[in-house]
Amino acid sequence: MNDVLTEPDPRTRDEIERALAVYFDGLHHGDVSRLAKVFHPAAVYATATEGTLTRLTMDEYFPIVDARPSPASRGEERRDSIASIHLAGPVTALAVVTLAMGPKRFTDLLTMIRLDDRWQIISKVFHYDLDES
């Protein structure tokens, strides 16, 4: 990418990919307990897709996830992928992922930190587009 961000070694990539799998599973199933395993308690959720800032704490975000019908419960096929993973340092990573839920196609910029021997999302900043179909 550049000389500031680097590619993770295979072991680190695997650890981050496993954390992202929990993230994808949690969103697809609307499972807040899974999401709580991958989000740091002080994490921030933010977007400006609709023209104003939406910024939530996990205490605000998790009840929203819990209250909405999950993609799995609606019979949706799972549509998620990892676009890139880069390190800013040994305990700081940026993962760019894509996923779709209903008519929304999301690009998530997930800043991750390694604390307590595991990778955790400390910020989720995202954009979404609506499917034309």
Regions found by a protein language model. Give the residues of each.
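Surface-exposed, charged secondary-structure patches
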Residues: 15, 24, 44-105
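Short beta-strand segments enriched in hydrophobic/aromatic residues
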Residues: 39-40, 99, 125-126
